[in-house]
Amino acid sequence: MKSLLTLLLLSTLALHGQETTASADKTTFEFKDGDRLVLLGNTVFEREQRYGAFEPRLALALGETKVSVRNLAWSGDTVFGTARSYFGPPEEGIQRLSGHLDMLKPTVAMLCYGSELAFERLQGLPDFLTGYRSLIDLIRAKSPGVRIIVVAPPPVESLQPPLPDLSTENKNLSSLRDALRKFAMMQNAFFVDWFELMGGLPKPGLATKPLTENGVHYTPAGYEKLAAKLVQGLGLKIPEAPSPALENLRQAVIAKDTLFFNRWRPQNETYLFGFRKHEQGQNAKEIPMFDPLIAQG
């Protein structure tokens, strides 16, 4: 049975009667039918599941090529995975991620890391790149043949006081972008310059039409632009689609992402799998029951 998302996509394509295929040049990432795309990163990727902006546009751009998308991003995460740790040592975080990679077996992994370095004057950049390489090695070990996409973090914004001027941080992000471009080449990974696509180094002064709520975290309108530019950075073109049809796709994606979030980050996990599972551990068997619901989404 075709999923709800697939049916909505086909209806949308039929409405505007356009067909889109990715070009074969070197600036285009080639998706294959049936690809399993996993998003890995920190807050900018994690919050995408709130807005459902990226996946509908990717689906429209790919046309008949069907790609599933699963969001494994985690707010505050770094390439070392420490934010993912619960009650154990910091290393537990990367072990947790390893288990989720085992579960999903991605054929494509899109990673966006490093924004925190902009606020640290790029201190620790060598260690960051070493950790990034180790993370990619882990992904490749879990999913041999996986294709890697490295995404440069988008810019931050300088807003009205008392919020700080983030001009220096944007210069740091520009330098980080340059380092990530070289890193991606060395890793035989596709590179997306999200920083430049979102405007690059802004002009001096305050943002006149801000896309963030505080200079760092993007608004719903910001995510609309982020999503469109990310698809563009993959070398794909998004066909025109009627607003109601795109909204239907967006709602279907948000529903699917909510189900998946409850699958891999369930509430009260301590009772399900942790040190209190003896109290309610019998409920752990219900977590895999999300899988068929997610597949239909």
Segments from the language model and where they lie:
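Sec-dependent signal peptide recognition
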Residues: 1-7
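Hydrophobic h-region of N-terminal signal peptides that target proteins for export
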Residues: 9-17
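Serine-esterase "nucleophile elbow" of acetyl-processing enzymes
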Residues: 17-75, 90, 97-105, 109, ...
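Conserved catalytic region of serine esterases and O-acyltransferases that act on ester linkages
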Residues: 19, 32, 186, 209-297
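Structural recognition of the beta-strand scaffold that forms the well-ordered cores
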Residues: 36-40, 68-73, 107-113, 147-152, ...
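Oxyanion-hole/transition-state-stabilizing segment in secreted/luminal serine hydrolases
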Residues: 40, 50-52, 89-129, 260, ...
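Acidic/histidine-rich helix-loop elements
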Residues: 71-92, 119
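Substrate-gating cap/lid alpha-helix
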Residues: 158-194
